[in-house]
Structures are given as C-alpha cells and as structure tokens.
C-alpha cells in the first residue's frame, strides 16, 4: 500500500527509497525521531543509505530501493514516514 501511494503521488519520478529501521530495529517511541534524523543526515551528506538485509525485494514494489551500498544522490527534499501502533502515523517533508 505504501509503495502504491508513493507511485501515485510521484507519477513517473522514482526517487531513491531507504528504510533506516532495517539497521536500527524498532525503537518504539524513538523510531520516528531517529528516522527523521537519518533523513536530515542524508540531505546533508548527499548519500542515501542502503537498506540493510534487503536480499529479496518484492517485485511488485515498483520503487527505487537502495540496496547493497549507499548511493550518492544530491537532493533538496526528503520524505520521512513513520507508522506507529494504533494508527499514529506521520510524514515529514524536509528540505535543505
């Protein structure tokens, strides 16, 4: 569902997608803050971190998942989405 929403919103534009939680584990109440920090650091460094342990991505997830190694990608905007227990969800759009 998330991938479908990303594709509907962005059309043919396919930005690189990462998932910090694969590296950190679930940090419960701190997860959203840590993922937002990861997005800020990606903007600052120009590197999108690879998704750790993504060995067999879903073919139906039509996104540019960053795998195996970090990818250089100078960008001006990052989107950080967090989905919490009980439907407590948030999306942050961050810019340089």
Q: Each predicted region: which residue ranges?
A:
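Conserved "HGTGT" condensation-loop signature of ketosynthase/thiolase-family condensing enzymes
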Residues: 1-96
């Amino acid at each position: 569902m998330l991938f479908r929403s990303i594709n509907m919103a962005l059309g043919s534009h396919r930005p690189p997608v990462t998932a910090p939680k694969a590296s950190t584990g679930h940090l419960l109440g701190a997860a959203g803050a840590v993922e937002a920090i990861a997005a800020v650091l990606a903007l600052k460094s120009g590197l999108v971190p690879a998704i750790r342990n993504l060995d067999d991505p879903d073919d139906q997830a039509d996104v540019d998942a960053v795998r195996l190694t970090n990818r250089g990608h100078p960008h001006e905007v990052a989107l950080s989405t967090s989905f919490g227990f009980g439907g407590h969800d948030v999306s942050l759009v961050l810019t340089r």
